[in-house]
Structures are given as C-alpha cells and as structure tokens.
A protein has these predicted regions:
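Charged, low-complexity intrinsically disordered terminal segments
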Residues: 1-342
Length: 342
C-alpha cells in the first residue's frame, strides 16, 4: 500500500519548473538525478548548471544523464560522429565541470546512425524526496520556453523509483535496453518504455484506453499515428500538434509526412512551439483517465525503440490541471474541428 504524496501533484510550465528545480538543487542534501533528451548550459539554464556543480562540490550525490542528441542534432552523419560545434564544445565543458566537482555526467546513445533511432526521450528529475517528471521539458533554452510542462510530486517512494530508473538507464551499455515496465505508485501507474524496438507500455496503455473512451483530449508535439492515432482521431474534438512550418527540418518532415499518410489535421494555431504530450480519456460513465509524459503517441518512435516515461492517472486534481493547461496555452486561437482530409 502506497502512502499519499506529501502534497497534491502540481503542473509547472517550463520556466516555473526551471526556477523550482534550481532552488531545490541549491538546497539539496542527499541526491540529485536528472535525465533528459538534452541538457545544455544556455542563457536560461546556466543557473541550474551552476547549482548542479555547486551541489556536487559540497558532497551531494549528483548524477546527470542526457542523450548525445544534445550536441549531435544537425551535426552528425550516418557513418561518423558529430562534427565540431558550439554545442559539442559546451557539452564537453559541462561534462568536465560536473565531473571535476565530484558529480557524474553520462551521455546516452550513439552519435552515428538514424537520428531518431534509440534515443532517450525520458524526462525526470529527483532532488532528495521530490520528483519532477511526466512532462516533456528539456534542459536547454528551447526546452524551457516551449509550450510544455512537468508534474512536481513530493513522494519519497516515487523519488526512489525514478532515481533507480535514472541509474539503471545510465548503467546500460550503448545497445542495451531494459524491457517496458509498469510501476504502481500513489500518484498512479508509472509507465516506462525501456527502448526496445516495438515495445511500449505507454502506447499500449493509451491504445487500450482510447478504444474504451467516449471522447479524448489530445495534445502532442507530433501528429498521432498508427492504431492509436486512428482511435484518438475518431473520438477527439480535433487534434492538437504543431504545423510543419513551426518545426525544424527533421521534425517538420516527420509532421508533414504523418499528416499526408493519416489525413489528420491540427487545430493548433498559436505560434509558440508545442511540446507537451498528454491524452485525457473520458469514459462513457464520465470517469476521466489521463496519460501524460514524454511520449508523443507516434508509432514510429515505438518501432525505432525510444526510452520514454509517462503517468497514467485518474486523479481529478492532476487531470483538471492538464485540461486547464490545454485551454489556456493550447486551445487559444484554434481553428474549427477538422481531423481528417485536406
């Protein structure tokens, strides 16, 4: 039996998450764990990086993991590693400074091959007994300014689980991937994709709920695809993802090709880049279930093998916050519902 969290989970947008985390790291006593796709010393994240280094220097167990995508995006080839770049130089400096202070820095994945294969897309942070996860915020300037959020949970058991997950991911060999798993916690079911190609606890759970739901609220960076995309589109009051012109070349190509293949269209009309990922399912009896986290609900990510994390919850307090986020930061300026066709 799990104890309830010390406080109700709270949804924090990127800038608020960064401020909260930086303050927590500055007063950390025992441990800090951070996993994200990208971690970089940028203008907005510089204070956090300094706090991580200072915490390690005063004896806190600080461990940071990020995907090599941090510095290879746009600079890697299919056969060779990343070419020299400002981000590569910055990553090397971060590695050196954190290790020099007594912390650990682990770069995940390979620099060569397909850019979307085998990525670590998981986002989680732990400071002592507080956890931030189940959202999509990366630790660089674009990450904290996107339309996105993280959930803050004061729960020692959850913090222990996420700390262990961070360490397990960091300990894996480059080609090693753990199986998908589901952990029961007071906040709900924690769905973990270990990155094995074709295996996703998150996609499977979302598909199962979508098939049972009467209606679905959708928000994601990308156009939903595969059987989940079809089930969501049938039940959603429109789909909410970026238009291709809002994205960088690789992401724009993925969005455009997904739209062409599925016929789905987006109602999102705001200019800021949408990076949040959530589904809220309303059952025929009125019960609501949400899945929120790092997964974009795209079948290709499952096929390629991507590490992800999400929360499945029935907590009305959490779901209300997700729906309010959607109303205030996603729905504003929307076009009329239209999910299929030209």
């Amino acid at each position: 039996m799990h104890l309830k969290p010390a406080a109700p989970p709270s949804l924090l947008r990127g800038a608020a998450y960064l401020r909260d985390l930086t303050s927590a790291v500055a007063s950390a006593q025992r441990r800090v764990r951070l996993t994200a796709l990208t971690v970089s010393r940028d203008a907005l994240t510089s204070d956090l990086i300094d706090a991580l280094i200072d915490a390690a220097a005063r004896g806190v167990d600080v461990r940071v993991s990020a995907d090599v995508f941090t510095y290879t995006a746009g600079s890697a080839s299919m056969v060779g590693g990343a070419m020299p770049s400002r981000r590569r130089t910055s990553a090397a400096a971060l590695d050196r400074d954190l290790r020099g202070a007594g912390g650990t820095m682990r770069w995940l994945g390979r620099e060569t091959g397909l850019p979307f294969r085998g990525r670590t897309h998981t986002k989680l942070t732990v400071v002592d007994d507080v956890a931030w996860s189940f959202g999509g915020v990366n630790m660089d300037d674009p990450g904290v300014t996107n339309v996105d959020y993280m959930l803050r949970v004061e729960d020692a058991a959850l913090a222990d689980s996420l700390s262990s997950l961070h360490d397990a991911i960091a300990a894996e060999a480059p080609r090693e991937r753990m199986p998908a798993q589901v952990l029961d916690h007071a906040v709900g079911r924690v769905l973990i994709d270990g990155g094995r190609p074709g295996e996703s606890a998150i996609y499977a759970a979302a598909l199962a709920w979508a098939r049972r739901a009467e209606s679905v609220l959708h928000v994601s960076q990308y156009c939903p695809t595969g059987p989940l995309g079809r089930e969501v589109a049938r039940r959603a009051d429109g789909l909410w993802f970026n238009r291709p012109r809002q994205a960088a070349f690789a992401n724009a190509t993925l969005i455009a090709s997904s739209m062409a293949t599925t016929g789905h269209r987006t109602r999102y009309r705001r200019e800021p880049y949408l990076h949040a990922k959530a589904l809220v399912f309303t059952m025929p009896d009125g019960e609501r279930v949400a899945i929120t986290g790092s997964h974009n609900f795209v079948a290709a990510g499952v096929r390629l093998g991507t590490r992800e994390i999400a929360l499945e919850t029935r907590d009305p307090h959490v779901i209300d916050q997700i729906e309010r986020f959607h109303t205030e930061h996603v729905r504003a300026g929307a076009r009329a519902p239209h999910t299929h066709g030209v």
